[in-house]
Amino acid sequence: MPAKEVAVCSNSFNGTIGETIIFKNNHSSAVDITQNGTATWPFATPPATPSPCVPAKSGNTEGTLSVTLLSTPGTYTYNTVGCPQIADVNPKTVIIS
């Protein structure tokens, strides 16, 4: 089964435990994914430190970053830095079931 693709600047998404997600960035600036304060980091990989980065779009090619969701169901939050102002709403939410 191919990995689910999610726009890195979207406000929320649903996933399943241990699922691989491909964050896609179609903007001209890179987007960092950061921990929401002391909230549980929703990704098994990569770690929260250093903050993972989804590269900027290059030509017609979107930047991508592969992440793996935790194996514990729940609602988790994280932040992004670098999304266009209209999409730069934090925290973002992922519901893992």
Task: Put a short name on every predicted segment.
Residues 4-6, 46, 51, 86:
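N-terminal targeting/disorder module
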Residues 29, 47, 82-84:
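A generic structural signal for solvent-exposed, polar alpha-helical segments
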Residues 24-27:
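Asparagine-centered strand-capping/turn motif at beta-strand->loop junctions
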Residues 19, 29-33:
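Short beta-strand/loop motifs in extracellular/secreted proteins, especially
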